[in-house]
Each structure stands twice: as structure tokens, then as C-alpha cells.
């Protein structure tokens, strides 16, 4: 039994676990070795890094109550700045000395069961030392669970309470325990972090952990030893990694790696004693930031005696930046900012007394103080403003910058509020606006850091709002609401509701723009309390009584609150029942734009909008530009987690044709954060009235009173309220409104007065002229602190890891302008004197801008800094020193400036990345290592092959101790340069201008780490530099001046001749025009440009110079490179030229518009045709000569000769022997010229192709039969085919796949099979149709049989071409003198040294306007020229081209715009051709071309791969309706097309007219299109018989009651400019009579015996050949067709036409929303067209028409109808109660004593009362029109009355 018990005891003991919670024995001391290091840099090896290493011995001894003492012995600090891992750490005695001073004393901490409690240290211990101790003790922190070996929990540590995972392994044999603890620093309940400058960046509602830029983790490995006395930690190692990926690239990251190692060395049996020094409790392990953050990690400066340091630094800045920015100016400015943060108010006051009388010192000091943002600097600035020490501009800049850069805390808020309410600020409205907006931003930043915003912070703005609404001050209301919007606090919600009509009845009188501001102020509040805000906004949106603009802004703000599906569905339901089309269009377009969003965090809203859109009508998607819309575009790059969004809100007003408000905003999101970058809004009210206001006294006309009296006869009619003119704009940056402006009526009138005021009385122009005459001189420098972004987290060592970005901008302008007038101006001069004077201006301008940005990552403490810095700077200088002479009378301008004496850097951009180390012990000494060292190893794929000898030699050289010296020999650098060639990039491009002695160069130097990882970060690392430099260039003669002269007008021709031959100036003035013309042609070299002669220039292929500098030099011959891509174009041109007609100068017929695809296909198949058929001998001779000529042209043109031969053979077979021979000679002599310039042959290619097409059909019928089965041509319409065709024509069908509409000409055999016919009649894609030019209709082809048809047609075309060529000169100078001449040249010893000459010819008064521009080199030896020509050839075609090179023949780009028909619709085609362009231009275009398909896809285009002409692009736009068009874009290898593209406005598209009915000349689209579009926008109202079409294009039928005038249309504004009344004329319903009251006239028109009689003011006018003009009223009346036309544009009637049956009225655009009557309001509200005079909507057209009838007094007029409320003649039951009902709107009834002979049913609303209720009141007393509508019923309205016993009232 005893044995059994002993065994059980042993078993239980063996199975029992030791207590594995670590701890220390209070009776012993423990000695540990500690080492911790941090390194910052990229994750790749052999790159520069910076870091620090701390090593020491730790002694831990026990105290009672689980307390222990920690003593840090022998601390050593080492720095690292070099290439990792090559370079070693270096000991820093200075930092060691500083750190040792705080570790000489003891620390105490609490420790129990593996958990660290409170930490105690001496009271004056620096925060840095306490945090380092926290990092050490953090290694002892453990949470052990005895029952689990793997578990997770949220654990407190130095970085906060974060997610930790434990894995425990036990080694019982050796009594060891191994614990692994990993901490996820991205998943923390309470993360220790501090950010500055990020208050306006808010997180996306997505998986934030996945999207973060910075990520971190820590791993701990523990070794524990178990013993009888407990478990002891013997070894701890930790490794922490923080990485930042600026571009969200997986491998493009910068890394901070920290390591810790703790090893137990010795355990002693001794006990610690309590320290004698008082200890302060510093809290737990949680890292604590110091009260004042360390200075910016850009430099370390001494903080003692900041006053002296600030003065010294300011002196250095001012003295070293007089003329230009010094290299260290940004660092010096940042130093002043840092010192100002340290200084107190007394220091700043002392400094101010020293520099207050020095303007330059003041400016730098005020800028630095504004950027400091501390409590002391804010006090200092408040004193300056209170004492009026600053002028207005300084106060404005200082207040704005200070408040927006202020550090918001509980100390700065009261001072900022005091500054805002100071008397100096309150006196000036602009200063008050800036101060209030700035203060509200301070409140926003402060409250974003706290859970509850204090009431005291909001009270100043709330008081402003209360005062504004109590006094009715609109300006204060606007300011208060914008400030509330900036703050974005829910506590302000009650104030906002006071401005909205949903909760305040008095708010209905508040202007609309104030209500809109109140709604936009809810946006930020909705981020904190979305449910409440959404409830108010949906009420506003659903309330149809509110103004549409207010409701639309409510919709916009709702979607900013990220509504759920239910709310979005509610919005769609509101829009579905909406009668206001502006609101419906806005809601629909907003939903549709959101439904297409690609942003991940918008997915829920996007999908909800997709669902809600299905509830709405698709017709809302086709609304025109008159309706409000939301335009939204966003993009997102998932690889980089970055996106951008742009939104434009277009809000239209019913009272204008154009938007009344436009709001545009740009947002960016990256790594789970979103920022509203910029938002701009513009609102316009009543501006059209101010602009269109005429000095016409409408109220003084007699018709004004008549119209006003007639209005009283209408039930409830009121004039439209006068719209208060207002122009407002605002600017938001990062979601905060920083400025806004309101321009009221008075200011608008003042501006308009200044604009329209005669120049002689314009004070502004006089002031400018006087200022120039008195000279302007000054210098201005303004530094601007753009802000800082700082993000700090603790590392496991206890050192802070900081990410930061700092940007500084400095602007400078030195101006000196002197002016002189000849003759001198008097004191009170008139502006007309300037037109007779010669002005000389001498100016010296030196503007410059410097922007410096630094991004850092690393350790930043007050004692040392070890970080990675990326520095970027951009500096621009634009010195301009010139003398100008302006002679307005002679239209001459001459500018002279100095040549390039020295190198001037216009733009310089630099970018560098370094590893930087600084410490407080060595101020001014900075260790820097480039992140990308010069000897960084290459990728293995870039390593060059080395021989064994060289390799061994290099290996031997590396064995020495100095094998990696920082200074290398020249040879080694050369080897390095060769070895690093692939990562170093260098490029220089210079544009030399020898004639002015200058060259403009662009240089780029780049060396990056992309060879390691191809990421944006690696491309950013290294050194980059780009410059644009103006440099002198060597010339034969020293240039003294550069002169630019511009001569306009009639003297331009003489000036050109004088420039070349100065002696001929006198004789030129008396020379005849022909001589001057001949001289100009000779000077410009026109003959050599345009002639097609036997001898042409042979381009020489010069060898290209190898080097990095590419010279594009004016005046020198460019390289004549013949690439493979250009040879195809040359061959096309050559083949077309070789087959030209007998006359070499014959021009291309204007109506021969052959598709270039057909041309290309013909050129391809001509060779096959020549191989399959026998050619004539003449064609062989022609092709042989053409081939030889092509071979001489260039080596790469050989491929074009075969095409030339084949084309020539098919062409020559169509001519007789004589023409064939001459054609051969012509092609032989000119093929060389044409192969290099397609322009020379383009004029004859089309006609020759036509000839070839017709003739080859006779010569190659056999080949056509053989190729008939290859045809793939599809046609629609009627097919007219011939019995045979040439193979060339056949090949056009099956290669180009052209599809024709209308009467399509089939070139194939007419015996097609049924399968082919099924394809023909099938549906075609839009890109398969062929564009048909309109001018073919002007000269149609004649279809005559046989050879006779060809002969007659060719002769007709030839004669037409001859006459057309005679009337269309190649050189415009043959009929016109130049309108402008410009000369640029250098001057040496008062002699001109050549240069450039620009000449412009223009013929704008012709039916076919044309402009020609010639740029020539004035150097005799140069033939370089540039020619440009733009012209309208006829009513349907406009062309333009640019040619340049030797005599304008080397390169060419041309474009063409043609109108015609496409797929049966009117269309326009734009064609762009580039036969030959320089290689650099081609490379840029090819780069841009890569983005075209993607952009087209995003725009909704479909694409199809196809082989199109390689050097041509064309776009066809076909109008399928007034609001839609089809678009086809054909590029060299792709076709993009889209059908039914919506147009923003309607275009005038008439019905399709058959081609046979088109008469020449067809409509001139180029001259009349703009005016036609504008005319189409104007509204028209028409009445014909019983059909009425309103201004809003609503059509309805209405039979007018007899003898009663209706208000057809009138001006309902307060001006009452006109009134048009209409009634039926007699018994005939189709005849009408009208009465017009306008100005001082009353005009009647009525039909009599089939003619229209005209009475003006009661006097009858003759009916034939009438033309009445009333100058006083701007009124015109004349005969038109069978009636009269009236025009009074100044009174609001563009045109009124009346012929007795039809009335048509057209009003101008500015009358939108101002009309009323049966024609409607002209407000685009089609659903609200039946608007009655009282403002309510009628239920049908009949009630609508009746409401606009004018009642007449009994027995005084022909109209016997009047309106009265009626009682329903039956009893109805409502809710079970018998009721009697009365109409809520009046119904037409015959007058008393009259009986109705005709009636019409109308639907009327009724208000019901109980049947037993007494009703003794009259209709007027009851006011039924103000009662609610209980039911609807139909009653009869009287339309015709018989009055035998009419009662006439006295």
C-alpha cells in the first residue's frame, strides 16, 4: 500500500507544471547585456542607410512589493551612415556623453507575473531617457496563459494596446521554455501615434488595414529557465519592422528595422536599496510624447538664446538673397520658423523693435511667425494687429496664414477668438471674412482631436449667426454659414435650421443663395451625425414648394453622406413623381454618374444607384444642356491603391438659358484615406439683366400701364419678382473654405460702367497710362510656408520613428518700368492721344519662384537625427530686360533686348535622396551618404563579361585595406560610368538660333535604383536633375542686340522689301503693285515652293552624329532620314503622281473626294492587275522611269517603285499614245519631288485615280472575272452594277470593305447569288458605311454609255478644274498684300546679321476665306522654310496644312474638314494626314497614341482592329437626330465607333433631302453654322388652326372661345415690355386676329377678305410693300410671304409672323423664364407647362387656355364670358357624409342675361362642405381658390354665348 501511495505522489508531482510566469527574486540582482539598433532605408542591400545603435549593461535588483531597480551602466551610442552592410557603425562620443548623463541615476519599475507596471524616474529626467527605458522593459513584458500554448490577445506595450499572438514550447528535459510573441502594430485598440497636418484627411470606409501606407510588426523570442525559485528570462531577442510604401507597391517600400538583444550574464545574491532621490511616476510601458515635439528633422539648431539666433539668421537671409535665392535659403527660413516656435512673446517683441523699420526683415519675420503656429507667436501677431503696426496687405496675409497653420489646442483657441473679434478686424469686411474662416478651421482641427467639442469654441460663430439673422444682414448670414460649414460640428445644427424653410416659417423670405449655403454647411456635420442630417435633407428634396436650386443642393449633400440603399430608393421615388424637370434631371444624372464609379469604397453606393435607376424613366438620360446635371469621372489604380475623382455640378435656373451655378471639385484617395483637394463654385443671378440692360424707359410708355391694367383681369396674376443681380464665388482647399467673394448689384453696375465707358473717360486706363509714364520700380519677396505633415510612432527601442514632409515656397519679383511718350502727354489727356503717339518703354523684370520639398523617414530626437531624406526643389527664373517702341498709328512694334551673354537657367529641377545623420554635439556637421552609391552593384543581367586577367587583377586590388576609397581615379570612374550606364540617364536637346546668338537647351541627368526593383520608389531614389537653360552660341560676328519687329497693315509689304534691300525703300513706295508683288515672291522664294519643275532638290543623307546632344537648328537643313514608316507614304505619293494626267500642273478636282482607303487598296492591287494582264509599251517605259527616279530618291524608296510601276501601267493604258507619253515624261521628271513630299502630288492623284478607274475597266475585263469570287463588299439601298469592272476596282470592294448607303454603286458583277444578296440587305455596323462628300452633289457624275461617257466626263471635269484653278491661286500674295510681317534677327555693329521672317497673308472678306503663313530664314545660304495654309475651299470643305524643311518640302501635316452624308445622315468628316514628320514628333505621337484605346473605352466607344492607311486618321460625326450623333474614328490600326452619342444641345438638322433634289450651292456650313446653332437655341411659339406649340415645345390642341382675347405671350417681368393677344376672327376657327402692345404702339393684325389688315395705333396701313420702322421703340414691320413680320429685339421679340392663320413668335435667349401666357414661361419645364396666371398648374389644356382669357366689362366688348366659382350640381358623400362641393378654381360662364350655345367639359377640383352647413357667403368671401381640394369632377365650361338680355352694370 505504501508503494502504491508513493507512486501516485510521484506521478502527481511529475505531471504538475512549474509556474512559468517570469519574475525576479527580490533577494538577488541580475546583470544583462543589452543592445538595440535601428536602421532606416530601402529594404535592398548595398544601398545607403542611416541609423543608431545603443549598447549597455543592465543591472536589475529587487525591492519589496514587486518593485525593482534598474540601473543602466556603460551606455554606448554608435551611429551608422553608409552603405549597408559594407560600412561599420562608428562610435559617437558626443551622443554617448549626452545619453550617459541621464542614465547615471536609477530607475524603478513594478513587475509581476511577466507584466510591467508603473515606471519611476527622477523628476528632471528627459522624456527621451524614460522612453528608452520603456523600450528596454518592454522586452520583459509577457502574458502567459498556463492552460494554452497558442493563443491571441490584445496586449499593452510600448506601442499601445495591440494584437499579440503567443506560441509556447516547453523543454522539460532541460527545464527550458521558449516563447514566441508577435505583435501586429496595424491592429491596435489604442495605438500610440501622433500626426500633425493631417486633420483634413479622413479615412475611407473600407478595409483600412489593407490600405495603409505604413505597416508594422514586432517579433519577440524568449528563452526562460525554470528553477525552484521561479522562472527567469535568460535571453530575449526582438525584431521590429515598419515599412512605408508611398505608392502602395509591394516591393517599393522604405523600411525601418529595429533589433534588440538581451542576454543574462550574471545573477548575484544581493538586494537593492531604495534610491535616495525622489522618484516621479511616469506611467506604464505606453510611450509618451514630450509636451513639445522635437524640432523638424531637417536640421539641429541650438535653442538657447533664440532672440539672438533669429536676428542673426534674418540678417544672413536678407544679405545673401538680394539678387537671387541662395542655396540654403529654405533651410535658413525653416530655422527661423523653428526658433520662433521656441521663442516667447517677449523675445519676439524685442526682435520686432529691432526690425520694424526694415521692410525686408519685417517680411521674413512675419512669414516665419505666421508659420510657427504657437501660442506665443499668436499673441505677438495679435498685438501687432491691435497696435496697427501692419498695413492692410500684411494684415491680410498674416491673419490668413497664421490661422490656417496654427497648432489648434486649448491654449491657442481663446487667443484666435480674441483676434477674430478685435476692432481692427471687424472694421474691414475682407479682414473679418478671412479671420472668421480661419478661426472656424482652427475649431475644426481642434475638435477633430477630441471626443466632444467645447461650447466655448463654437460660441463666437454661433453669435455671428444669431446676430445676422436677427438683423437680416445677408452678408453676415453668408459668412456665418460658411464658418459653420468649416467647423462641421453637430452642435451647430440648430443654427443652420433657422435658415431653412422646413423648420422656420420666416426662412421662406431668406434669399435662395443663403438657403443653399445653409444646406452645404450640413455636409461636414453629416460625417458625424449622418442620420439626423439625412432626415432634414430628404424633407427638403421632397418638398416641391421649395426652389429647385435648394432641392438640388440637398440631393448633392445627401450623396455626400453615403446613404444606404433604402434612402437612395426613396430619392429615386421622389424623382419618379417629380414635376420639376431640373430636379429630376439632376437626381438622375447624379445617380447615373455614381453608378459608374470604380472606387472600392463607393461600391455600396454604386450598386444601390444601379438598382434605383431602374425605377426612373430612361428619358431623363436624354435631357439637354438646359437641365441641371452632375458630371462625374473617377479612376482607380488597384495596383497602387490610389484614385482620383472629379465632379462638376451644373445647376440651371428657369430664368436663364445658361447655368446659374457651377461647382467643381477634385478629390484624391490613397492608401485608405480621402482628401478633398480643391473645390470651386461660381453662382450667377440676374447677370443677364445687367449685361443686356438697355436705356429704354419701358415704364414711361403708355402700353406699360395698359399691360398692367390688363393683368388685373387675370385671376391671381402677378409680375415676376425682380431678380437681384449677384455674382458669388468661393474656394475650398482640403475641404475648408478659405475665401469667397460676393459681387452685388452696385458693384456689378460699377464694373459694367467701367467696361462700357468710353475710353476717353475711363479712369482705370488713364491711371495705368499715368503710372507707366511716371515709371514703376520695386522689389517684392514673399516666403510662404506651405505646411508640414508629420506622423510619429514609437519604435521598440523607445526612440520615435517619424515620417515627415515639409514644403516651402519663395516668390520674388523685381520690376523696373519706364515709359516715354512722343509727343508728351498733358496732365488731362484723352485716350485718343495714345493712338497718335509713339510710346517707348524700357523695362527690367526679374520674376523668380523657388519651391523646396523634403520628405524624411527616421529617428528624430532633440539630441540626434538619423533619417532618409528625399529632397526636391524647383527654381524658375525669367529675367526680361527689353526696350519696346510702339507706334500705334503706323501699326509698328519694335522690341530690342540683349543677347545671351551668359548662361541663364530658366527652370531647374533637382531631386536627391540621402541617408543623413546629425547630433547635437556636432552642430553644423552633417553626415550624408547617397542612397544610391556610385559603386552600387549591378543586376546580374547587367554585369559585363570580364576576362580572367582583368578579373584577377580586380580581385587582387580588392584585397587591400583601402579597396573602397571614396575618391576614385579618373580611370576607375570611367569604368564605373560604363558599368552603371544602364541606370544613369543623360540627355541634352538644344535648339540653336545662330542668327540671334542664343540656344535654348533642355538637359536631363538621372541616376536611380530601378535596376534593383522596377518600382516608382526605386525610380525616385537617386539623383535627378532637369534644366531649361538659355545659353550663348558662337557666331561669326558678335551680336550686340536682338530685335523683334512686327509690322501690321498696308505697310507690311514695303517693310518686307526694305528688310532685304534697304536701298529700295524710296523706290518701293512709287513702284506699281505688280513690281512689289514680284519682289515679294522673289524674297519669299514662292516660286521654288509651289512650282512642280523637272529639276527638284535631291536630299542628301547626312550621317547622324553620335552623341547625347540632339540639335534642332533653325536655318540648317534637318536630317533627311528615310525610315521604313515613311517609305510607304512616299510610295503612295509616288504611285499616285506617276499616274497623273498629261498636264503636270493640273489641280485636283474639288468634287473628286475619293476615300483614301480606296486609294490604298487600289495601289495594293494595281501590281496584281499588272501581273495578270499585259501592259502596253508606253506603260512599261513610264514605270521604268518612275522606278529609276525612285531609286535615286532614297535607298528605302525601292519598295515604292514597284507600286509606282503598277499604278503607272494601269493609268497609262487608259490614255492615247500622246497623253501616255507625256504622262510618262511627267512622272519621270517629278517623281523624285513627289516621293519626298506628298503635297506635290496630292493635287493630281485623285484625278489620275479616276482616270485609271474608268480606263482599266476596258483593258482588264479578264482579270475582273478572275477576281470576282473574292469580293466581300456589302451594300444597302439600290445597287447599280456594270457588267464588268477592273481588278483594281474589284480589289477596292474586298479590301476596304466599304459600305454605302443610299444609291450605292456596285463595282462588281450584277449576277450575284442569293447568299450575297442576304448579306447586302442585312444590317451593317456603323463603321462599315462610307462617308459621301457633299460637294459631289454639286457636280454629279454623269452616267453615259461606253467610251463616250468617259471622254465627255473627263472633258467636263478638265474644263471645270481649269476654271477652278484659275480662280483659286496657290499663292495668296498674287491677289492680296500681306497683313502682317514679323522679323527676328540679331544686330552687330548696327548691322543686321540675319534671322527669321514671318509673313501672313489673309483674305477674310472673301466668300472663301483663306490665310497663309510663311516663315523663312533670312540667311542667304539657307533654304529652310515653313509654310502654313488654311482655307475654306467651298461651302462644304475646309483644308489646312503645315509644311516645313527645304523649300517647305521635307515634312508635312495636313487636315481637312468636309461636310456630307454618312449612313444617310448629315455628317462632317475631319481627316488628318502626316506623309512625313520628324522622328521626335512621331515618337511623341506614338506615346500619346498608346492611351487612345483606353480613353475611348472609358468614354464608351467600341473598337475593332483593322488595317487603315498608316499615315492617316479620320473622324466622322453623323447627326442622327438634333440631339444624337454617331461617331466613327479610323486610326491606322484600329477603328473606334459609338452610336447615339448624346449632344448637350440641339443642332439644326432638317429632314433628309434626296441627292437628286439638292441644288448648288448647298448650305455653307462654315459661314452659317454658328449663327444657325444660336438661332436654334432661341424659343419659338406657334399657333396654327387649333394646334399650339409652346416655347418649351409642348404641343396641344385648343379651340378658342369666340370673340375673347387670350394672352398669347407677354413679358411677365417688372418691365412689362410687350404683350401679344390673340382671338378667333369671326366664325372661322382657322382665322385669328392679334393685338400687340409694345413700346408706344398698339398694333392690330386681322384677316379681311383673304388679306391681312394692319393697324398701327388705330390707323390702317397699306398692305403691299410695307416697311414700317419706329426708331423710338426699335420696331420693324414688313411684308413676308402672305403676311407681316414684326421685329423688336430691344423689347424681347426677335420676330413675330402673322398671316391670318398662323402665328409664330421667336424671343431672344435673355427672355428665358420671363414670359407667360399660352406660349408658356420658356423655362424648359415641360411637365409644368400648363401654368395658370395664379401660379398653379391647370389639369388640362382647356383649363389652361381658359385661364388666359381676358374678361371684358359687360356690354363693352365682344367677349361675353367671365369666370366664376361653381357649385357641383349633385350631392356627394365624403367619408360617409353627404356634402355639397364648390370649385376651387373658376370656370367660364356666360355673362348675366346670356345663355351658352357651346360648352366644353373641363376637369375641376372641388372643396366640399357638409350638406347641412349654412353658407351665406359669396364666392369672393369664401375664397374657394384658397381652400383644399377634396375631389375632382367634370363640369361644362361655356365657350359661346347668345346675349339677348345682357345685363349691363352701371
Swiss-Prot record:
Family annotation (Gene3D superfamilies): Lipovitellin, beta-sheet shell regions, chain A, Lipovitellin-phosvitin complex, chain A, domain 4, Lipovitellin. Chain A, domain 3, Vitellinogen, beta-sheet shell domain, Vitellinogen, superhelical
Keywords, alphabetical: Disulfide bond, Glycoprotein, Phosphoprotein, Signal, Storage protein
Mod. after translation: Phosvitin, an egg yolk storage protein, is one of the most highly phosphorylated (10%) proteins in nature. Cathepsin D is responsible for intraoocytic processing of vitellogenin.
Disulfide bonds: 1581-1719, 1604-1755
Induction section of the entry: By steroids (estrogen).
Residue intervals passing through the bilayer: none
Signal sequence region: 1-15
Biased composition (Basic residues): 1267-1277
Basic and acidic residues biased stretches: 1156-1165, 1338-1350
Biased composition regions of type Low complexity, renumbered to the chain: 1122-1143, 1167-1266, 1278-1291
Region (Disordered): 935-984, 1115-1313, 1338-1362
Cited Pfam families: Vit_b-sht_shell, Vit_open_b-sht, Vitellogenin_N, VWD
GO molecular function (one): lipid transporter activity
The Vitellogenin domain, residue ranges: 24-662
Domain VWFD as annotated: residue spans: 1579-1756
GO biological process terms, semicolon-separated: cellular response to estrogen stimulus; response to estradiol
Residues carrying a glycan: 604, 1094, 1177, 1188, 1280, 1417, 1597, 1665
Additional observations: Vitellogenin II is the most abundant of the three vitellogenins (I, II, and III).
Protein name according to UniProt: Vitellogenin-2
Organism: Gallus gallus (Chicken)
Gene assigned in the entry: VTG2
